[in-house]
């Protein structure tokens, strides 16, 4: 409704001014939307922007009111538009429907890759920021109506996997013992690294394994596949606990076996930017890179980047929009990949780079064995959530409290990580993340549960899609913004915008709840406010689910 109304106002402004860009922007505290077109017309018309704004407002106000129900006001150099009663009525009628915020089905095919951690140990706190950013974006794309495939790119032939395979062969480790496979693989990897650090000459064995797997040796391929699968099974369990699922796992080795890597290296070798010495590399100085981009080693084996290029060419041929989520430590290789694909004339991926989330406990290095796994984070957050839930709802059975505590824990983790803009590093704070009274996932869940409780206590009412008074109108207009925010997230690739929106909706609802009697109101006022509570409940539910968070009916 917000977008439809803005589009109608923009069309009227274009008709009146003759300008394609009518400079609509957020209206702030004074309006729902505003136009700054008077500034751009000032030089052409040789008038002050404030005078132009007055003239535009006077000329279009009747048409705007007739077509949209919005009031037009000139305030200084701005043309402000305040949406009216009809707008609020339409918003509420839509907002109580299941699936509110769902966009029209699109034809543009989107592929989104996220997480893609090396299968040499459990996911850690740093990995799950990638996971949560990627999964939230995926949910927003689906909400916006895009056909989407979510992929996990499995590095099943890199040096880390060679070290694991060597470690299993030389240490006799039982990776099929009881326990999560990713943690068992980490034990092997850490111990193998200790041996390699003590005896560096053993690295020749690792190099030999990498050559064998690239040449297609079946025994070595099998030697690599077994620990990779064991580790991925552990990853999938962790991801499922966080409400995350990938549509497809793509294996790096596929692009060696199907010949795509060899083909792309051949293409690259004929480029003017190619540098063939002992290695094959690309001169990317035209893109600001000082060092050449090495793609093939002196021993003839391809590096990870070469397989990654082949993978992205395949994605570009099968999808219309290609999106990757990568940590800031991958910024160099990510931008080198983009430059190379541009030179090749292939589809260039959009990359969401993120800074890392950390805990006060410090290091998360898998190689040294100093890391805090995602499993440990979830378990500790669940323990703390259980304490909070027990303090609030001691009358519930232990099973009920555990169920709520798990949902609250995942909400706390997901929201605390997604609420910060990806480009900014953050420290996960248990106290803030689990605070039911402040800016947290559980706080938004609690607002939803409160709305559910009000409606259950009300029992029956007659839906009334009207909003009167400052509190009701403010809440209705916040509800109206939900579809707009989803569009902004998928356009700008900024999932934190949805987190901010959901928190603000919870804030406005809580203010409304404390200021306006709902259950104690009578007649039409009661019906009106209960309808608004239901619209809020449904919008909070849709927002929470799009954030990957359970919309609990009771907490």
Curated annotation (Swiss-Prot):
- Xref: InterPro entries: aa-tRNA-synth_I_CS, Arg-tRNA-ligase, Arg-tRNA-synth_N, Arg-tRNA-synth_N_sf, ArgRS_core, DALR_anticod-bd, Rossmann-like_a/b/a_fold, tRNAsynth_Ia_anticodon-bd
Keywords attached to this entry: Aminoacyl-tRNA synthetase, ATP-binding, Cytoplasm, Ligase, Nucleotide-binding, Protein biosynthesis
Signal sequence, renumbered to the chain: none
Q: Which GO terms describe its biological process?
A: arginyl-tRNA aminoacylation
- Similarity remark: Belongs to the class-I aminoacyl-tRNA synthetase family.
- What does it catalyze? tRNA(Arg) + L-arginine + ATP = L-arginyl-tRNA(Arg) + AMP + diphosphate
Q: Where in the cell does this protein reside? A: Cytoplasm
The listed location of motif 'HIGH' region is: 117-127
Q: Which CDD domains match?
A: ArgRS_core (cd00671)
Query: From what organism does this protein derive?
Result: Methanospirillum hungatei JF-1 (strain ATCC 27890 / DSM 864 / NBRC 100397 / JF-1)
- An example molecular function term from Gene Ontology annotations: arginine-tRNA ligase activity
Q: Which Gene3D superfamilies match?
A: Arginyl tRNA synthetase N-terminal domain (3.30.1360.70), HUPs (3.40.50.620), Isoleucyl-tRNA Synthetase, Domain 1 (1.10.730.10)
Q: Name one GO cellular component term.
A: cytoplasm
Database matches in PROSITE patterns: AA_TRNA_LIGASE_I
- This chain's protein is named Arginine--tRNA ligase
**UniProt xrefs under PANTHER family:** ARGININE--TRNA LIGASE, CYTOPLASMIC, ARGINYL-TRNA SYNTHETASE
Q: What Enzyme Commission number does this protein have?
A: 6.1.1.19
Q: Which NCBIfam families match?
A: argS (TIGR00456)
